[in-house]
UniProtKB/Swiss-Prot annotation:
Pathway: Glycolipid biosynthesis; lipid IV(A) biosynthesis; lipid IV(A) from (3R)-3-hydroxytetradecanoyl-[acyl-carrier-protein] and UDP-N-acetyl-alpha-D-glucosamine: step 2/6
Name of protein: UDP-3-O-acyl-N-acetylglucosamine deacetylase
A Pfam family it matches: LpxC
Record's keyword annotation contains Lipid biosynthesis: yes
Lipid metabolism keyword on record: yes
Entry binding sites for Zn(2+): 79, 236, 240
GO biological process: lipid A biosynthetic process
Amino acid sequence: MQQSTLLKPVSCYGIGVHSGKRTQLTIEPTKENTGIIFIRTDISSENNYIEASYFNVSDTLLSTTISNDHKVQISTIEHLMAALWGCSIDNAIIKIDGPEVPIMDGSSKPFVFMIECAGKKLQNAPKKYLKILKDIKVVHKDCELYCTPSDHMTVDLTIDFSSKAIGRQNLSFRDQESFTKNIADARTFGFIRDVDYLKSKGLAQGASFENAIGIDEQDKILNPNGLRYEDEFVRHKLLDLFGDLYTNGTSIVSAIKGYKTSHALNNELLHRIFSDTTSYKFVTSSEL
């Protein structure tokens, strides 16, 4: 299997869910073995680019933020990263004229649509995979995420909320190709009781029912059209997991299991994997 990039550039406009700032984002093709690179076009400096890598993750509060050594940052990258992973895009340049990726409708679907409109180009380099060789586990209080060796990627994810609108939900995922049909359109969510506090901290400035599922104090879904799936919440957490894990630069070949995962836990798993060179190896499809 070969690496892929886009056939042509594709752009969108939107607001950041936390910053509330309107930005333009363009996904551009690039050469083999580049990976995913973000460029802040509103900063006129050679220091305006950031590699979408787990070691550049600088904040995981409610979203995933990456930054470089010059303190240039881009936040809320996970939905776009999930779309790139789900569409098997290995190499792309992301140009953005602001500090936050547009939230769009709160899911990955608009980014999947953009990539499908641009088309995909196979490149003259083998696609790489991260194959897990030993059991690795990260735990924070009652939250946990672990991966074990496997010949295929599988994910089993459970979430557990006290809110009756969500409750306990579980989802198993076996096929990357089904991401665009079954996971990509699952939206982010939040509780109305938290909005004032978040806004006082400079967060959720762009949040609305157009880009998030809102849940009130009576555990009622406030969006006029309701949910897209009965288990949309766990689907979105799975989406976040894929986006965060793609900051390792490849698809992971492992059996992954998570309980009450978070952006912080997702990132910690990657750090734990790469801290032990005997726990993984990079392979091509012919070596799987």
